[in-house]
Amino acid sequence: MNNNLCVLCTLEERRNVHYEDDDLIVLDCASCLVPMIVWREHTMELTKKMEIKMTAVLEAIGFKVFGTQKFYIDRQQRAVPNHLHWHARSNLSTAR
């Protein structure tokens, strides 16, 4: 896939950026409006170090947005199946 065509590589629409650094960005997902963490590099390969960093950053944002223990990290790739990204979703959501 040409990375210029990947919506998570270009991130032309940025809603409510919660955090960003050279490796990742956390912003509100345009389709479901919950915090979404995106690894900047177009990859699905996840090292242990990447997993630890992504989990820690998204948990910190989730605690701020939803409160302690009121959210979970959804690691399922849906609309963009080939670019690593996760969502912080409310525990009150019915779909998992």
Language-model segments: residues:
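HIT superfamily nucleotide-processing domains
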Residues: M1-R96
